[in-house]
Amino acid sequence: MERPITAARTARSFGLATEIQFCRSHHRERDEEIIAALAAAGEPYVVLELLDRGRAREMLQVWRGHRVEELSECDDLTTTLHATGDVYACCQLDIGVDQMKRTPVFLGSIRSADSDAAARDRREQL
């Protein structure tokens, strides 16, 4: 949890608004560890129930991803910590730049470091 907490604190130090969003997984113990780490750090968070499975799956659409260098500038990033431990950033959904909507940028994993560029590229899916 050090990376997203540090990212949120760093963003705030530059005057940016931050919000940590959390979706529960089927790994209950790990979920509780994440929540405990956020509480211990004094970081507020929002619990979201929108997932890519179950009742919410029909709400998600397939979007074409873009490489970072293809994207227009965005000054309103949302950082997402997935239940897998992967951390992504993307522009807010209501931004006027269509290419940037729901185009995740893989920041890393809180569980393990990728050993090579090929593994990182597979996770980024760019």
UniProtKB/Swiss-Prot annotation:
Catalyzes the conversion of fortimicin KH to fortimicin KR. It comes from Micromonospora olivasterospora. Signal peptide: none annotated. Its EC number is 5.-.-.-. Keywords: Antibiotic biosynthesis, Isomerase. GO terms for molecular function: isomerase activity. GO terms for biological process: antibiotic biosynthetic process. Pathway: Antibiotic biosynthesis; fortimicin biosynthesis. The gene is fms11. The lineage of its organism: Bacteria, Bacillati, Actinomycetota, Actinomycetes, Micromonosporales. This is Fortimicin KH epimerase.
